[in-house]
Amino acid sequence: MAVIKMKPTSPGMRGMVKISRDHLHKGEPYAPLLEPQFQHSGRNNNGHITVRHKGGGHKHHYRVVDFKRNKDAIPAKVERIEYDPNRTAHIALICYADGERAYIIAPRGLEVGATILSGSEAPIRVGNTLPIRNIPVGSTIHCIEMQIGKGAQIARSAGTSATLLAREGTYAQVRMRSGEVRKIHIECRATIGEVANEEHSLRRLGKAGVKRWMGIRPTVRGVVMNPVDHPHGGGEGKTGEGRHPVDPWGNLTKGYRTRNNKRTQVMIVSRRKK
C-alpha cells in the first residue's frame, strides 16, 4: 500500500494525501450482501436535530459484514479485498466451501486466494477466528467480542489491534491500543492479526469539501455565537468563554469524564492512557 501526495495544482490539492487503492477490487460489490442505507441527517422522527454536524454526503450501500465468524470448521477462500465507504478498514469477500459468501474485516497480510478458518480447532494464522481460550498469550488480535456470541466490537478500525496479556480462570486480560487493560471472557472470539489499511492515519483531506462528501457539516465555535445559542456566546468584540468550557447545554466538556457504567466497571483492569 502506498501514500500518494497530490501535486499543488489548486489550493484544495495542496497538502492533500491519499491512500493508494490499486490492490483493491475495482468492480462492483457483491450485491446479495448489500443493504440500503437511509440518510437521516441527524434528525429524529419529528425532524428535530438530535446529532449536530451531520447531513449531505455521498450515497452508498451498507456492506453486511460478518462480525460473528461462527461458521466453524468450514474453510473459506478469500476472493477479493474491497473498499468499504462505511468504515476505515478494508473488507474481504470470502467464499466458504459450501458456497456461502460473506464479508469480513480484512486483516493486514491477508492475500487473495488465502484460506481462513473459524472455530476452536483453527490454526494460529492471520485471519483465523478462535475463542480466546485457544489463542496463545502475547498474540496480536482484532475483532474481539465483548459478550459471547454477540459479534466483534473491539479493534475493528483501520490499523488497530489488541494484545492478549494473560488468562486467569474464565477471563483473559487484553490490552487495547489506548493502553486500557480489560477483562474479556475466554469463550469470546477474536481474530488473529491486526486490521489492514494501517496507513489510513496518514491521509490528509486537503479541503473542506471532502468532509462534506463524508456527510459531516461544519462545527461552529460557541464563542462566536450569541448568548441565546451557546453559553460561551456574547460579549463585545472578541472574548473568551469566561467560564469552564461547556457544551451548548451547559455540560462540562474538554477532559471531563462522562463514563458512568457501573455494570462493566469491574471489567476494566487499568484505565486508558490520556
From Swiss-Prot:
Entry annotated with the keyword RNA-binding: yes
GO biological process: cytoplasmic translation
Organism: Polaromonas naphthalenivorans (strain CJ2)
Protein name as annotated: Large ribosomal subunit protein uL2
Alphabetical list of InterPro entries matching this protein: NA-bd_OB-fold, Rib_uL2_dom2, Ribosomal_uL2, Ribosomal_uL2_bac/org-type, Ribosomal_uL2_C, Ribosomal_uL2_CS, Ribosomal_uL2_dom3, Ribosomal_uL2_RNA-bd_dom
Stated family: Belongs to the universal ribosomal protein uL2 family.
Primary gene name: rplB
Top-level division of the source organism's lineage: Bacteria
Subunit record text: Part of the 50S ribosomal subunit. Forms a bridge to the 30S subunit in the 70S ribosome.
Region (Disordered): 224-256
